[in-house]
């Protein structure tokens, strides 16, 4: 399971790469994580700008305009990859390596961003999760 310092590293690397970018499209390859991804809620972030990323305990909190928050827990093996406009793939933590063939089958959610960039949620064991909340209800749902 990613320890707290690793989650902080992921937050910092993602903040640097995706802050102020807009979600153009979301592709769900497999919604069967620890909790199923709510497809109706994930569609609501399309067209929204990512304003900031925070960490609370081992949760990553992605704050979008329109007061929507995407809460992510990496579980045991969850990770993010960032692909820039030159199609260069970056990892967001130092605990794993990039292996395009091996990684591809575990890319569960792909967020297509403006400027032809992508954010990929990858989780081999599927113990992580992605949930959505209104900003005002967020802290009632953290446990």
Regions found by a protein language model. Give the residues of each.
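Phosphate/anion-contacting hairpin/loop surfaces
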Residues: 70-143
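Structured interface patches
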Residues: 31-40
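Generic beta-strand structural signal
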Residues: 55, 63-64
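A short, Trp-centered hydrophobic/proline-enriched beta-strand micro-motif
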Residues: 18-32
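A glycine-biased structural micro-motif
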Residues: 19-23, 43-51
